[in-house]
């Protein structure tokens, strides 16, 4: 019962912007998810999952591993210093805000409080600037069902 929290290392090379997971970690994720198919799981990784120059080089391979494993519910990532959310094939993609400084004016700096629920997760933005318009706002993530197909929402 509960949620499985899987942490991945996407650093390929120090002082280089893009990241990579590689075959060994992708195989490990598949084995870990396969060992508990009924338990919801989430992944944390530093690099953004969008297939862009500054993100994960192997996003396509990661999604090929995750799409059929319906117990994977969400990927949390950072790297872009943006607070946003979208979904790909029912998998929530949560881009966490920067905790030190924002790249773009208006982006919150802070952290996100996560509260597990039976069929999802409640996220609450905690901005260092209590006057930020998104400070304290909550987002309800609903888990995709283990056996259902997911619709694609997002850019990849």
Briefly describe each language-model feature range.
Residues 12, 48-52, 99-101:
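Short histidine/acidic/glycine/proline-rich micro-motifs that form metal-
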Residues 2, 38, 117-119:
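Short strand-connecting beta-turns/loops that link adjacent beta-strands
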Residues 4-6, 16-92, 146-155:
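His/acidic metal-ligating clusters that form di-metal
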Residues 84-156:
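Binuclear metal-dependent phosphoesterase catalytic core
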Residues 12-23, 102-106, 140:
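Acidic/histidine-rich helix-loop elements
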Residues 2-3, 10-12:
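Formylglycine-dependent
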Residues 9, 44-46, 96, 124:
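A cross-family glycoside hydrolase active-site/sugar-binding cleft signature
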